[in-house]
Amino acid sequence: MDIILGIRVQDSVILASSKAVTRGISVLKDSDDKTRQLSPHTLMSFAGEAGDTVQFAEYIQANIQLYSIREDYELSPQAVSSFVRQELAKSIRSRRPYQVNVLIGGYDKKKNKPELYQIDYLGTKVELPYGAHGYSGFYTFSLLDHHYRPDMTTEEGLDLLKLCVQELEKRMPMDFKGVIVKIVDKDGIRQVDDFQAQ
């Protein structure tokens, strides 16, 4: 029951992921970070089967960083998302497919604009203004549809994210231990340490 949310605003992308790691009715960890920094301006959040998510995320992170070192070139968020989509598409045709859904948020330095991509475990990729995986989509898409504007500032995006998290806390039968929120903009990736949904 992982929660990952992404919102693209005027000059950044905001990604939020639940802190809880659960198995059945047990909470195994209450401070898990379900994101990986793939490059200085690209962040991936992931949800899915416990073993698959971490293994896949580390594999993607290592390969993107290896490419950057070999070629001395930072891949754009679009190029990173295409690589991730290709790996998931290859995986689904193997004997041991990854059961991983991802959101990739980044800032393209050449185009000077933020980008958000949603990719599911079948290798379907789409660029969106906002996205969610897991049960979070059922409860938050109506809020996002109603309140989202492409010209929102980062602060307005964080306020919209607070509305979404409040709705999840009210509607979901489980405690997901809050969310870790990260912002990707022209200056890089930073974590929002004082994010409170109340």
Curated annotation (Swiss-Prot):
Gene3D superfamilies: Glutamine Phosphoribosylpyrophosphate, subunit 1, domain 1 (3.60.20.10). CDD domains: proteasome_beta_type_2. The modification Phosphoserine is found at residue 76. GO terms for molecular function: endopeptidase activator activity. It is found in: Cytoplasm; Nucleus. The modification N-acetylmethionine is found at residue 1. GO terms for biological process: proteasomal ubiquitin-independent protein catabolic process; proteasome-mediated ubiquitin-dependent protein catabolic process. Pfam families: Proteasome. Disulfide bonds: none annotated. GO terms for cellular component: cytosol; endoplasmic reticulum membrane; nucleus; proteasome complex; proteasome core complex, beta-subunit complex. PANTHER family: METALLOPROTEASE TLDD, PROTEASOME SUBUNIT BETA TYPE-1. Present with 21800 molecules/cell in log phase SD medium. The 26S proteasome consists of a 20S proteasome core and two 19S regulatory subunits. The 20S proteasome core is composed of 28 subunits that are arranged in four stacked rings, resulting in a barrel-shaped structure. The two end rings are each formed by seven alpha subunits, and the two central rings are each formed by seven beta subunits. The catalytic chamber with the active sites is on the inside of the barrel. This is Proteasome subunit beta type-4. It comes from Saccharomyces cerevisiae (strain ATCC 204508 / S288c) (Baker's yeast). The lineage of its organism: Eukaryota, Fungi, Dikarya, Ascomycota, Saccharomycotina.
